[in-house]
Amino acid sequence: MRLILLGAPGAGKGTQAGFIKDKYNIPQISTGDMLRAAVKAGTPLGIAAKKIMDEGGLVSDDIIIGLVKDRLKDGDCANGYLFDGFPRTIPQADAMKDAGVAIDYVLEIDVPDEAIVERMSGRRVHPASGRTYHVKFNPPKVAGRDDVTGEELIQRDDDKEETVKKRLSVYHDQTEVLVGYYNKWAESGQPGAPKYRKIAGVGPVDQIRDNAFKALEG
């Protein structure tokens, strides 16, 4: 099972990625993790990436694709792999295709923006314990207070409505084009074209999980 997960930030990709990894016994490929590992190991690509990052630059797609190809040679990728958060742009998707990175499925988790804003901006956290609440879906017994200690709950900066809306805007501008890109490729019937599947990311987590598994079996 070799797949790419697509969806806006807050669509629940991370949750579903966990279920898919466990079911198919495949690793989640994170470009951030790969970069850190390559820099730490001092590989040629890692050294090149470190030089760019130290200068405050963005690591090129060529280096990222090189890291991806190296990572896919590892033994834990024998059953496949899962990409979440990569590719983010058409040039990255083209580079993956040109490098011969095989993909069986592209799974899009579709959630309306207003549902994502409600889901993320309603989160509240008890900093000391990490306990999380939601003002609507999982409220504390006393508004704004942790159930166990009675201490104040906070809203993380990442969960503030304006931040969530900004991230969604970046997604729609830069990454949403991949939906059309992979849809078109899937419909082309070309050798090596992936199957494109879209599921709704709203509703009970277990139901979304079951729908994801069903989509990846057809």
Curated annotation (Swiss-Prot):
It catalyses: AMP + ATP = 2 ADP. This is Adenylate kinase. GO terms for cellular component: cytoplasm. Belongs to the adenylate kinase family. PROSITE patterns: ADENYLATE_KINASE. AMP binds at residues 31, 36, 57-59, 85-88, 92, 156, 167. GO terms for biological process: AMP salvage.
